[in-house]
């Protein structure tokens, strides 16, 4: 086990999570136009990421030791993948109703947010475990990547 490699991988995972939030916010208006969603509806879709993050942290964090950090990171990857693919391949009106599009986008965004929460659940204790004598220092470095 190479602590430096694991720490760098954790930083990259957090950067990826940060980019998922930034990109989703940048595409909010085009998504609303393409899927015939109101400003309120697209705001609810974007907010689903924060709900997903909170739910993932509340549900999975107490189980992190039982599941293991590797499994939590793999689950984060699966949530990110499913959420991104759900967004990319979501059917647009008139093929489906705007309501259906809304829920597909909402669930996809919830999954991406859950993935972001799962990344946090795994990398924070990992950094503290890798550097037990410098926990605060390395946790600060780790979170310097968050926008």
Please identify what each model-predicted range represents:
Residues 33-35, 40, 65-66, 97-98, ...:
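Membrane-helix boundary and inter-helical linker elements of multi-pass secondary transporters
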């Amino acid at each position: 086990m190479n602590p430096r490699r694991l720490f760098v991988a954790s930083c990259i995972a957090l950067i990826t999570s940060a980019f998922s939030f930034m990109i989703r916010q940048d595409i909010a208006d085009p998504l609303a136009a393409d899927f015939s969603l109101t400003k309120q509806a697209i705001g609810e879709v974007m907010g689903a990421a924060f709900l997903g993050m909170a739910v993932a942290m509340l549900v999975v964090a107490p189980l992190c030791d039982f599941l293991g950090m590797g499994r939590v990171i793999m689950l984060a990857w699966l949530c990110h993948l499913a959420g991104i693919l759900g967004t990319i391949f979501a059917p647009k009106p008139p093929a489906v109703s705007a309501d259906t599009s809304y829920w597909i986008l909402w669930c996809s965004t919830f999954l991406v947010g859950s993935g972001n929460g799962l990344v946090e659940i795994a990398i924070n204790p990992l950094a503290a475990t890798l550097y037990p004598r410098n926990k605060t220092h390395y946790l600060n470095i780790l979170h310097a990547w968050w926008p």
